[in-house]
Amino acid sequence: GSDKKILLIWESYYTTSSKSWDIINFPEKWYFDSPQADIDGIKEFAKVKEKEEYCRHWNFASKMHPKGIDRKSRTFSNVENLLKKYFPKDKNPFEFCAGYNFYLRPAETSKTIGEKSIDNEIAAKTLKEVIRILTPEYVVFFSKKSYEEFKDYKKEFPTVVFKAFTHPACRWWNKAYGKEGQSGKDRFKDFLEKKVFNTMA
């Protein structure tokens, strides 16, 4: 499975620091008017053993690295559990995938970003550039909101397979819904088996 080029897209970053809210609650300020020193000042570090380099909240390594502070959350463990069967048993399956969050302005902890048009525009333009640089075969969204904002740009990448699934931490990951009568977990499992790795052929 390591020859497959897969880009995984989640939804939002979060910040737990109230010091950052004056910046992140104003999109134009966040993207264009905040001095770098202010942004650097609100990047938080969690003290988890000696692996501080993997624990920065805004660093995606905190989510995809085996020792990352967010790695055991359902948002990532539910995805990992389905991916790992396709990669060597002693390997982290996320080593073979790229991943990041669609929205680039953090939300307050556990709150929706409350995105503005500028958030959607910058997020979509950024993802287009990421796709052009990484040239993935598959782009998988674990955020229907993010997918809806990006789907009109799919035509610019005719060789890329795009697919959206429900968020791995929401109730529909394990609960059947829709015309197919499948859970998000089963839909993702079928996609991996039938479309990506062709193990059902």
Task: Please tell me what each predicted stretch does.
Residues 11-12, 136, 144-145, 167-168:
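An acidic- and aromatic-residue-enriched active-site/binding cleft used to recognize and process polar
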